[in-house]
Amino acid sequence: DWLWDQVESESHFPKMNATDKAELLRHLSEAEGLEQFLHKAYLGQKRFSLEGTDALVPMLHLVIEKIAQAGGQEVILGMAHRGRLNVLTHIVGISYGELLAEFEGPSYQGGQLDISGTGDVKYHHGARGTRVIDGLGTIRIELAPNPSHLEFINPVVAGMARSRQFKTTENDRPADTHAIVPILIHGDAACAAEGVVAETLNLARLNGYGVGGTIHFILNNQVGFTTDPREGRSTVYASDLAKGYGIPVLHVNADDAEACLAAVRLAAAYRSHFEDDFVIDLVGYRRHGHNEGDEPAYTQPLEYENITKHPTVRAIYADQLATEGIISQEEARTLEDAVAGKLRE
């Protein structure tokens, strides 16, 4: 009944004011600007671009804000390689300089990146940062490092969250599940196919393992390396596994930026109210190949003929705001130029 009422009332889909819309466009411009700069400056280098699901960046900004409003002190993120560089810079807060140093040579020591021993490829690194939330103080953000074993990080993040939830309490009191919140970002193919996903979900509601709910994002670019969904899973949706555990799933169009934020508001409210998992299936596409050295038109020629012509979510939203008279196309281009200027500095 609670979930039904929330959806029917559209309380999670409030009318956004001009300031909030401008901020959303800024976040989209930053996400797209970073990817486009790296594509030009380091042509062919692997980075596993977020392009096609760029809305993840403003979604993470908002979910962290909502977690802080519910009493959260720390967010622990787990994800594979796709989009990690964007999350490291725009969510965790490492500098562009530290990120670009990873493209130039040996790992930079002394920054925010979690680097030890001989180091690792840039899209495996973790990092720690903080964010100031207006009126609420500071919230800690940690992105756990991850190997190329995609969903390997799921139980690790759950374990990190559970241990820290107990550290926030005293005298053996119950864990504070509102203080420490885990967020997992899955790939669509891996989420449906890898057993560790089901194993972690199976533990989520057990007294000895529960973390008070994980917020899940599926970066659904509708292809797994070169495999189409119909050839990679026996279910309609990449998120169908969650149905077996009674976990709510919300499918959202990655090109509808404001709807993406509405999904986040509902997910955060559900997790806070029920202390249980929630899944957002962010349905988009992958603008380049599996990595930037691949040519996807060899294996998905018709799909990539369409993707090449398709505008980015930033461009779509900029057009929407221009039509609404909130931000002109010239102002949107100025915002793009400002992001590019920061990256060139």
Predicted regions and their residues:
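Flexible glycine-/small-residue-enriched beta->alpha junction loops
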Residues: E305-P311
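A mobile, often basic/glycine-rich helix-loop segment
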Residues: T299-Y304
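Conserved phosphate-handling catalytic cores of large alpha/beta enzymes
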Residues: G224-T235, K243-G289, G293, A297
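Active-site-proximal loop->helix
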Residues: D240
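Conserved internal helical-beta-strand scaffold that buttresses enzyme catalytic cores
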Residues: D1-V197, L201-T214, L219-R230, S234, ...
